[in-house]
């Protein structure tokens, strides 16, 4: 039986004014003359329609990130780096967003994970006068864009909660231009700012919190290279609680009389799925027939990731953590069988995810089976050999070959043309992740250590003051991500964390 279909909706007017109408054009011309349409041109250049009915938040953010010319640092399709909804999955699995939509706080988290600077305000954390001032500032600049989270009912539109970028502002008429990403439903339209405020001042039933708006702009520093904070797994909540609440409480124990004991207690108390919070960013590309080298940009990205990885392993904290995890004196070039199994599992999982995304399946890797994986070395355009994991993924009888560009630290062991488990690979390991996690926690976390000597020694180990610049930027970015993750799930405004 054929399901009834719809072809667009008639825009209720009033209260809205269609952008392409005679009145809409007049409002545009007057606002342009008034200087409050400066952000419009970049937004309209990268404006897109949401690809799924519940992808309004992802589409709005994708438009804004591309308008700000923020480089995602990884390919979208072919050689092209470009923000697409499929790449905005660090804070919520795409299949869940497709089924349920996405909350205000998760969109804020996504924007930050993507490398943007974000200020967010729920309606009860600001005023309509402040909102008007923020919108005027953004509309008068090409460097900042505003995304609104609102309910459609005040505009007499069908539907419920929605996200869209605001493309401009008419100061005299006090009207805002909504660039509705659901273009299959409503065209861009002008609405009274007071009505938009009412639409944001509504409760999202999924969270019990009010909707609001966020200001998105470029950062002066680059986003993280090797790791990212992820809340795509349900276990992130227990890990966030561990970082923010459990660790400070644990440090009150007066029996923690040396750094080794302190670290042991921290490791023993880690939640079972601690590794789900901080994830390594692994680049996946479709393997083209006859392709046997890395491009200049792929080589540069891999080089920077390897540099960060090596800088992590050069820290005193890594040495202490490694000695704690391998008390029998395993050398730095050694790896346990569990590490090898972990690499094999990671390779198979990422190969399937990558193949699913590259084939256009944005929400699930079900039906994708990784038949085999192997390690090889390929030429990096005359700059030596780089380690790549190749995998063959099977889906519905069709095979797809993919490559994982794997950052590794220096090793004397040859990896070329080896089976995945036949050689030892110094890939990002659990020791690296634990080291990063300890560095990422806010400095005031450790103030509760009772023994002053232990406190001083431990604070020296986790201090970012003497870290190399590349690693320091990585840690500070992850620290901001964790701050957003902990703060945006509750009543607090998702503002910038305190300076280190």
From Swiss-Prot:
Keywords: Acyltransferase, Cadmium, Metal-binding, Transferase. It comes from Triticum aestivum. The keyword Translocase does not apply. One of its GO terms (biological process) is phytochelatin biosynthetic process. Expressed in roots and shoots. Belongs to the phytochelatin synthase family. InterPro entries: Papain-like_cys_pep_sf, PCS-like, PCS_N, PCS_N_sf, Phytochelatin_synthase_C. Induction: 5- to 10-fold by 100 uM cadmium. Pfam families: Phytochelatin (PF05023), Phytochelatin_C (PF09328). Requires cadmium for activity. One of its GO terms (molecular function) is metal ion binding. Residues 1-221 form the Peptidase C83 domain. This is Glutathione gamma-glutamylcysteinyltransferase 1. Its EC number is 2.3.2.15. It comes from the Eukaryota. It catalyses: [Glu(-Cys)](n)-Gly + glutathione + H(+) = [Glu(-Cys)](n+1)-Gly + glycine. Involved in the synthesis of phytochelatins (PC) and homophytochelatins (hPC), the heavy-metal-binding peptides of plants. The active site is at residues 56, 162, 180.
């Amino acid at each position: 039986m054929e399901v009834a279909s719809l072809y667009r909706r008639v825009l209720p007017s009033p209260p809205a004014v269609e952008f392409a109408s005679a009145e809409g054009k007049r409002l545009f011309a007057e606002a342009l003359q008034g200087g409050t349409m400066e952000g419009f041109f970049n937004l309209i250049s990268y404006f897109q329609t949401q690809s799924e009915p519940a992808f309004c938040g992802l589409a709005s953010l994708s438009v804004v990130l591309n308008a700000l010319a923020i480089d995602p640092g990884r390919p979208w399709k072919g050689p092209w780096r470009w923000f697409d909804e499929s790449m905005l999955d660090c804070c919520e699995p795409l299949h869940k967003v497709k089924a349920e939509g996405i909350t205000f706080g998760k969109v804020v988290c996504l924007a930050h994970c993507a490398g943007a600077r974000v200020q967010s305000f729920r309606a009860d954390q600001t005023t309509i006068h402040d909102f008007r001032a923020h919108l005027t500032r953004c509309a008068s600049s090409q460097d900042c864009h505003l995304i609104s989270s609102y309910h459609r009912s005040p505009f007499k539109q069908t539907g419920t909660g929605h996200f869209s970028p605001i493309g401009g502002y008419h100061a005299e008429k006090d009207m805002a231009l909504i660039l509705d990403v659901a273009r299959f439903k409503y065209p861009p339209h002008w609405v009274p700012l007071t009505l938009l405020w009412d639409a944001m001042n509504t409760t999202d039933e999924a969270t019990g919190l009010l909707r609001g708006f966020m200001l998105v702009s470029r950062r002066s520093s680059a986003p993280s290279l090797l790791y990212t904070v992820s809340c795509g797994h349900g276990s992130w909540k227990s890990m966030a609680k561990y970082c923010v609440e459990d660790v400070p409480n644990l440090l009150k124990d007066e029996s923690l009389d040396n750094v080794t004991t302190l670290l042991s207690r921290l490791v023993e108390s880690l939640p079972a799925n601690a590794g789900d919070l901080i994830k390594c960013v692994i680049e996946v590309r479709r393997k083209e027939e006859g392709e046997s080298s890395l491009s200049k940009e792929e080589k540069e990205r891999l080089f920077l990731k390897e540099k960060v990885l090596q800088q992590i392993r050069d820290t005193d904290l890594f040495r202490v953590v490694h000695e704690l995890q391998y008390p029998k004196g395993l050398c730095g070039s050694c790896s346990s069988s569990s590490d090898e199994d972990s690499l094999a599992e990671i390779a198979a999982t990422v190969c399937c995810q990558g193949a699913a995304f590259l084939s256009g399946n944005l929400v699930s890797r079900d039906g994708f089976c990784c038949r085999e994986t192997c390690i090889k070395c390929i030429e990096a355009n005359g700059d030596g050999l780089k380690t790549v994991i190749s995998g063959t993924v099977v889906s519905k009888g069709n095979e797809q070959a993919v490559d994982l560009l794997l950052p590794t630290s220096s090793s004397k062991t040859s990896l070329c043309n080896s089976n995945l488990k036949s050689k030892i690979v110094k890939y990002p390991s659990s020791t690296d992740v634990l080291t990063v996690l300890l560095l990422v926690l806010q400095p005031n976390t450790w103030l509760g250590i009772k023994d002053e000597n232990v406190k001083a020694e431990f604070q020296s180990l986790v201090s970012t003051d003497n870290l190399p610049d590349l690693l320091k930027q990585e840690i500070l970015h992850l620290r901001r991500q964790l701050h957003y993750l902990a703060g945006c799930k509750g009543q607090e405004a998702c503002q910038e964390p305190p300076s280190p």
